[in-house]
Design a protein with these regions (language model features):
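A short alpha/beta connector and helix-capping loop motif
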Residues: 529-541
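Gram-negative/organellar outer-membrane beta-barrel architecture
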Residues: 222-415, 477-480, 491-494, 506, ...
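Outer-membrane beta-barrel proteins
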Residues: 59, 339-345, 425-435, 559-564
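Short, solvent-exposed loop/turn segments at secondary-structure junctions
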Residues: 522-526, 560
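C-terminal outer-membrane beta-barrel translocator/porin domains of Gram-negative envelope proteins
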Residues: 275-280, 393-508, 516, 524
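Interaction-mediating elements
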Residues: 11-236, 240-247, 253-256, 265
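Bacterial Sec-dependent N-terminal signal peptides
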Residues: 1-16, 579
Length: 579
């Protein structure tokens, strides 16, 4: 066909295709071919394409028997469609039977290898085992073969081959045999990790890899399994995948290779300063916020936080989280938290938890925590006193990362903890003795995306301590950049607190976003019988640089409807360095 129009050089061509009869022309018109073309080659391609589409409709003997050039810009092609094949009889085979009668006149002789694994194909496709043939509309042949291969692949026959052989035409009927070579049914035997050259000194934690292999043990190898493996490796914040996983088939094993490189998952933020207090003594002030991950190649998470304003408050917190200890689904985490308020009291809390990993994102912990509090001034009053408390705790943690998003890598985080225990005080007031206590804390955060440019960050925080009596130095401290903004750090105290912390974020570019600050909270302090509503509001901006994320926030707050003063605006600047 291309040769027929090879010498035509008109700029615009019109193509008219007709059939040998009026009925055939109607069939051709129903296919809706393209009639306008820019050159002769396009016309030839269109005629060939139409012929292929006619074949798929059952006109397997269609042919062009007349080409006409009407004028310089108009061409005509005439098709003879032939008889339409309505259906196809596919011989699938039966365990112990000969081919059906419909094939007896055929000269084709089937061999055992050509009709292979018939029971397998019948089981997987849900076909009647008592029948040896399948009758399909001719137009469904392609979808039947594709769907069959897909089902085979889903059931571990990744190298299966399926095709029709010995195709014959008898009048308006097509006869064929289904040739099926299943190969060996493949399970995923091993997941192998390889690091890029730039991260050749890195290693993937052995406990993590063992749990991944255990999860997929005796799992059919198919594209869905490979996709799940790829998604599971995306849950680890300390590595990134440089390309899609690859499958290695050997006669005896099937392995999936995952290609990784080290991700910058360590964070540092802080400053240290010096100042003189009222008595002229040199004091430290500033803060340090450090988070390390997989530093000792065990997938561990270590966090260190220190903050001092030089006078009123000092906070020190250190924690470590060890997942998959002894290469089991068991995890261990521990924490120490020291808080000192002026020269009034100091609290030292220690906690240890043993956890079970449902998966890497979801963990359940049972633990023990204890707090020792010292009344530095030895007032031993009903509001401040030395005390010790102990709790048995249960904790559920869930987190989901969005590592494609460089500014907001944490998409969801949920932590729920409940503790049952008691407090012992030694003062001579009504708070003396042993008091049973219960507490619950809830922290839940999620990013809701309206579209790629607009996002709402919702953060819910709740704390409740149930006790017959309360003392000031056991109350929950909050306020500041990580809770209700617009208030000084840890300037508020409560036995019950609930807060909804929100940001509307407008993403200017992948490295820049603007956001609002709108926080609401309610708290109760039974040591002073005080209840109040809190409101925090403001604006902020975030900028991703080569080395981390720079955040600048302006916020103000109101306590129970107090007048808002511009002079109370709090400006916070954080530069979180990643390494």
């Amino acid at each position: 066909l291309l040769c027929f129009w090879a010498n035509s050089f008109a700029q615009n061509f019109q193509l008219k295709i007709i059939g040998n009869t009026t009925a055939e022309t109607k069939v051709i018109d129903s296919i809706k071919y393209n009639s306008l073309h820019a050159n002769a080659k396009a016309i030839a391609d269109e005629v060939n394409s139409l012929s292929e589409r006619l074949s798929k409709l059952g006109y397997i003997e269609n042919q062009v028997f007349e080409n006409t050039k009407k004028n310089d810009s108009t061409y005509s092609a005439k098709f003879n469609l032939g008889a339409q094949i309505k259906s196809i009889h596919i011989y699938i085979g039966r365990k112990s039977s000969s081919r059906p009668d419909i094939y007896q006149d055929s000269k084709v002789v089937a061999t055992q290898t050509e009709i292979n694994n018939n029971d397998i194909i019948k089981d997987l496709l849900g076909l009647d085992k008592s029948k040896d043939s399948l009758i399909l509309p001719y137009t469904e042949i392609e979808s039947f073969l594709n769907n069959s291969l897909q089902k085979l692949e889903q059931n571990g026959y990744a190298l299966a081959k399926l095709k029709l052989i010995n195709i014959q035409k008898k009048k308006n009927l097509l006869l064929a045999e289904l040739q099926f070579n299943s190969g060996r049914q493949r399970d995923l035997d091993e997941i192998v990790v390889q690091f890029a050259e730039s991260s050749k000194n890195s290693s993937f934690p052995k406990g993590h890899l063992k749990q991944m292999n255990r999860k997929y043990q005796n799992t059919f190898l198919n594209q869905e399994t490979v996709r799940r493996v790829q998604n599971d490796f995306e849950k680890f914040g300390f590595v990134s995948q440089i390309k899609n996983p690859e499958i290695l088939f050997t006669p005896d094993t099937t392995k999936v290779y995952v290609y990784l490189e080290k991700r910058k998952s360590n964070n540092f933020d802080g400053f240290i300063g010096f100042t003189n207090n009222e008595s002229g003594k040199l004091t430290f002030n500033g803060y340090l916020d450090l988070a390390l991950e997989n530093t000792i190649k065990a997938g561990e998470q270590f966090a260190l936080y220190w903050k001092s304003d030089g006078n009123n408050q000092r906070t020190f917190k250190a924690s470590i989280d060890l997942p998959y200890i002894f290469r089991s689904p068991i995890g261990l985490k521990a924490q120490i938290h020291i808080f000192k308020q002026d020269s009034i009291f100091q609290n030292t809390k220690t906690a240890i938890d043993l956890g079970y990993f449902i998966d890497y994102k979801t963990r359940i912990y049972l633990g023990y925590q204890a707090t020792e509090s010292s009344d530095i001034q030895n007032t031993n009053s009903s509001t401040i006193s030395d005390y010790n408390n102990t709790f048995l705790t249960a904790n559920l943690d869930y987190s989901k990362l969005d590592l494609v998003n460089s500014i907001f890598p944490k998409k969801t985080n949920i932590s729920i903890m409940m503790g049952l225990g008691s407090r012992v005080t030694s003062d001579l007031t009504e708070t003396a003795g042993t008091t049973k206590q219960t507490f619950i804390t809830i922290n839940a955060m999620h990013n809701f995306y309206l579209n790629p440019k607009n996002c709402f960050n919702i953060n819910y925080q709740n704390y409740f301590l149930k006790s017959d009596t309360y003392i000031i130095n056991e109350l929950y401290r909050f306020g500041g950049t990580k809770s209700i903004r617009g208030f000084a750090e840890n300037s508020l105290q409560a036995n019950f607190m609930t807060a909804l912390i929100t940001e509307y974020r407008y993403i200017v570019s992948p490295d820049l976003y603007l956001h609002s600050i709108l926080d609401y909270g309610y708290y109760e302090d039974k040591t002073s019988n005080y209840k109040a509503n809190l409101l925090g509001f403001g604006i902020g901006v975030g900028l991703r640089t080569k080395n981390g994320v720079l955040k600048l926030n302006f916020s103000n707050g109101s306590n129970d409807g107090q007048k808002i003063l511009f002079s109370n605006t709090i400006v916070t600047l954080n530069y979180n360095i990643e390494f």
